[in-house]
UniProtKB/Swiss-Prot annotation:
Belongs to the carbohydrate kinase PfkB family. NCBIfam families: 1-PFK, pfkB. The lineage of its organism: Bacteria, Bacillati, Bacillota, Bacilli, Bacillales. It comes from Bacillus subtilis (strain 168). It catalyses: beta-D-fructose 1-phosphate + ATP = beta-D-fructose 1,6-bisphosphate + ADP + H(+). It is an enzyme of class 2 (transferase). InterPro entries: 1-PFruKinase (IPR022463), Carboh/pur_kinase_PfkB_CS (IPR002173), PfkB_dom (IPR011611), Ribokinase-like (IPR029056), Tagatose/fructose_Pkinase (IPR017583). The keyword Nucleotide-binding applies. CDD domains: FruK_PfkB_like. It comes from the Bacteria. The gene is fruK. This is 1-phosphofructokinase. ATP binds at residues 248-249. Keywords: ATP-binding, Kinase, Nucleotide-binding, Transferase. Its EC number is 2.7.1.56.
Amino acid sequence: MIYTVTLNPSVDYIVHVEDFTVGGLNRSSYDTKYPGGKGINVSRLLKRHHVASKALGFVGGFTGEYIKTFLREENLETAFSEVKGDTRINVKLKTGDETEINGQGPTISDEDFKAFLEQFQSLQEGDIVVLAGSIPSSLPHDTYEKIAEACKQQNARVVLDISGEALLKATEMKPFLMKPNHHELGEMFGTAITSVEEAVPYGKKLVEQGAEHVIVSMAGDGALLFTNEAVYFANVPKGKLVNSVGAGDSVVAGFLAGISKQLPLEEAFRLGVTSGSATAFSEELGTEEFVQQLLPEVKVTRL
């Protein structure tokens, strides 16, 4: 079973405004909303690949109810923990440029987190737990390490799609998969990475430090997969960037869908990269049909 963890989910409110004026009254030409959060995105994409998962995390208030209802209508299994306060709202303002205003989210108490952590005692050997997104400010910086340790005690596999301070300690958690982009990879080693060639030695280091699989996304330049045995490169299909939100999560979901379907590793990687592109070229998360349409354009080569 695949479990996704979103500690600080959101309702993403996307507003399109033409001729935006700062300090004046603006009217949207189009707006929509849907559940946000990297783990939730992974669950939603897995569903589109016909792979089951269960979404975990903290929700509260009317916005939390919206998320649960929305995912229920998509036939997604959830086991969210209820907290006081409202799940945050993140505003994505599209005016030609894209501006984001992210809410803080509710306070999570020590008791809330302790009860949440107990869920992982029921994991089975071989289960996959995806830890994705930001850590709420009310939780300690080592929150992901605590969850990863609880997973390891049950011989479950951990996937990390995280950033910031938590990413710096990612390899200590011995993840089954981690997925930094090239900027994050550079930050981990105190350097700037601008090309595939520059990324290769640092991706290899992450494997040497304990990660089983590492996918490094290089935006329009493709993506790299590192394992103990080999390094693979995948190009990305041509298309217009429409949506940067959720593309990396889609790579994770596509790769895990391929693993769940017991595809060869290169094919799972190819499915992941294509899934990321399908989302990047869409207003929302990419559909299965769009992924299949783009799949022939993506080629995987061993470096």
